[in-house]
Design a protein with these regions (language model features):
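C-lobe/activation-segment region of protein kinase-like
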Residues: 86-160
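Conserved short submotifs of the Hanks-type protein kinase catalytic core
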Residues: 18-32
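Conserved HxN/HPN-centered segment at the entrance to the catalytic loop
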Residues: 3-18
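Catalytic-loop of the protein kinase fold
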Residues: 59-82, 89-91
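A conserved short helix/loop substructure at the end of the activation segment
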Residues: 166-175
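AlphaC helix of the protein kinase catalytic domain
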Residues: 33-43
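Activation segment signature within eukaryotic-like protein kinase domains
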Residues: 51-52
Length: 175
């Protein structure tokens, strides 16, 4: 499943205490989502849906722990898959993960995964994360070959999710 030399990444792990989540920094072995998809685009459909679900949960926990603060750069370079298939967010403040911020300076990455500032509305601070999440889901759907193939109903649901994440109409946006 993993290449022979999986790398260590500093990630944000969320610990539940009562009904509150607390962030903790950890170093975990795994590979970036973009590397995993490039190396092995074929995969089970449920695995892809699981990644999308886990990414949404990780972002929700991040927002709760940080009082609605934006993660900033949700994209395939900032998401890591552990050896046991869990999705984790990289710690963008860690010096060892500076390459993520460097990759975001590339024009192709900025154009695809970062919403231009002039289009970001004041109605939500989390709009950049929703936009990045929607673009990451689009990337997964375009770059993977699910087995069995997606049904029309599943394709429509994913389209509606990404449409809401990428929409500029305040009535159609996740809040």
């Amino acid at each position: 499943m993993f290449k022979s030399a999986a790398e260590n990444y500093e990630i944000i792990r969320f610990m539940e205490h009562g009904n509150r989540w607390h962030p903790a920094m950890d170093c975990v072995q795994g590979e970036l989502l973009i590397d995993r998809v490039r190396r092995c685009p074929e995969g089970e459909k449920e695995e892809g849906f699981g990644w999308i679900r886990q990414l949404a949960q990780q972002l929700e926990r991040f927002h709760r722990c940080r009082s609605g603060q934006c993660y900033r750069y949700v994209n395939p370079y900032s998401v890591m898959i552990t050896r046991d298939g869990q999705i984790m967010l990289l710690d963008l403040d860690a010096q060892s993960n500076a390459f993520v911020l460097k990759n975001m300076q590339k024009r192709a990455m900025r154009n695809h995964f970062v919403k231009p500032l002039l289009h970001i509305r004041d109605h939500t601070r989390l709009f950049a994360d929703f936009y990045g999440f929607g673009k990451t889901v689009q990337f997964l759907m375009a770059s993977t070959i699910p087995d069995p193939p997606l049904t029309r109903c599943e394709s429509r649901k994913l389209y509606r999710i990404t449409e809401k994440c990428l929409s500029e109409d305040p009535k159609r946006v996740y809040q």
